[in-house]
């Protein structure tokens, strides 16, 4: 077959998150795990909370973006976000020199991206430790862990939605 197809949106996998105290890994192991989803990339993960996620279809991803405000997001903010330097110091200086309306547009777009991530997780998260996910993601504490969990789950969701389980 010469054409490539997206994975089935019913595809599910179990993942853990690296902020879980039961997970042990170096920064390199963490990156390898996030890139591949291979639990063997982690030094240890026994007893970690397991998240069962499903792949999202293009329609699912589009609906998540719409619910997050795709039609009202700041286009100036989107352009600024794309143009932002990758070096942290350079980015800080660049951000400092933005006009007030540009800073507001960028902040608005970043808030939109956060809403997209939350919507993607709401649709894709099936279970947490074999229990229906419901609103459990909103009850993770501390807040810094909740944000990291969402961020890592989105990376896994995007990978399996676009590349499938073996996608690297």
Segments (PLM) and residue ranges:
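Short, intrinsically disordered N-terminal pre-domain segments
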Residues: 1-13
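Ser/Thr- (and often Asn-) enriched beta-sheet segments in non-cytosolic proteins
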Residues: 12-18, 50-52
